Amino acid sequence: MKKKFITSSFLLLIGGLITKLLGMIIKIIISSRIGINGLALYMLVLPTFSLLITVSQAGVPLALSKLVASSNKRPHELYSTLLLFLGVYNIILLFLVLISANFISTNLLHNNSCYLPVIGIAFVIPFTTLSSIIRSYFIGIGNMLPPVISNLIENFIRFIFAYYLLGFFTDYSTSIIVFIIIIFNIVSELISTLFLLIFIPKRKRRITFNNSYLKEVMCLAIPNLFSSFIGSFTYFLEPIILLLLSSSNNISIDYGILTGYVYPLLLLPTFFVNATAQALLPILSNSNNKNTNKLLRFIIFIILLFSIGTTFVFLLFGDKLLLFIYHNYFGFKYLRILSLFSFFLYIQPIFSIIFLSIGKTKYIFYTTLVSSFIRLSTMIIFLLFDFEIYSLIYSFLINVFCTFIYQIYLIKKEDILLF
């Protein structure tokens, strides 16, 4: 068990590190090419992108990995059934987004420039869903190499676009540039998906449909969908509420700085936690608590040390990191505040995997529901007292701490000894 976990963790850790670094480089290049106004527009539509991806995937990827890892059903029949189902579902969703794009940009985001980016998002989501399903299949069977390499290929293609091709479009309007950035995801997703298909034996590429498999997957996926949807919907509402309740004329710029500069840097270390969580899922799904408690305690201890280290780095060298990465100091004061609660943020994926592995997907839903309520309600309260962008920052801190306490309560309820 430990050997498999170490091997899987190592592959995901290295792949996650390279992917995060490539992603950071891509963000640097894009932000320098499109400027602060372009970045603000891009970050304004990003929550919509996240919400639609969540809806398009319907909570299936995690459920597929869980069932493939823990059941004796034929894995290829599981994923092919889901490909057919989600293929039809995503085509319907694409047309619905195209029809409602004008309403989303005008009435929700209050910015007509968001129209073209939303159109771009509609065409990207089916390709994102396709690659996500195939990656989840490989994670479920414990073969981490194909998804790791496909992620690297996807980000390398995006890097080539950002570095070599994006410069040809800088004379266009901000709306068109953001549309092009979003629509290029189709190319990167398609190439990475074709690479994944190489690792699937030809005899297993035949598409079949099994209705009983679909029902079983959806029973596990629906709680995941509700959980992910609530989280993404909360993220989607944040800029809408900020624009609605804030009296500052620069709130969209401040939001772009926070979500475009600070959050990516704060979340950069999560490659370590996400890699560990993904590697844990197949192992926890096939083990009992007695065999895994010791391993889980060790992992939490490592994440604690890791979080303390990142906090000190952000506090002492955050301004230098921002200058080195983005060539400006925008958001340093935000970063210093947010880094103080990094442990409570970084530990959450581990808890979610624990809940999934013991079949308590409802706990993930409860956690997301509590988290979203705390985040939105506290943000609204702070906005009413004119805290402006700090409303989002303070609500973020309160949210991650309260969510951590609630997750500990749920874990103790299941007699899992982590501390």
List the model feature ranges, each with a label.
Residues A58-N102, K290-T310:
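Membrane-water interface segments that mark the loop-to-transmembrane alpha-helix transition
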Residues L12-G16, S50, L86, G120-I121, ...:
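Residue-level signature of transmembrane alpha-helical cores of multipass secondary-active transporters
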Residues Q57-N72, L266-K290:
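Helix-loop junctions and terminal segments of transmembrane helices
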Residues K4-L62, L94, L98, V124, ...:
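Signature of the first transmembrane helix
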Residues I141-P146, F156-L194, G359-K362, S372-I405, ...:
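Membrane-interface helix-loop junctions in multi-pass transport and translocation proteins
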Residues F127-S150, L340-L369:
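Membrane-interface junctions at transmembrane-helix termini in multi-pass inner-membrane proteins
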Residues M1-K2, T174-I182, L197-G231, K413-F419:
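Interhelical loop/hinge segments that connect adjacent transmembrane helices in multipass membrane
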Residues I92-N112, F169, G309-N328, F332:
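Short membrane-interface helical motifs at transmembrane helix boundaries
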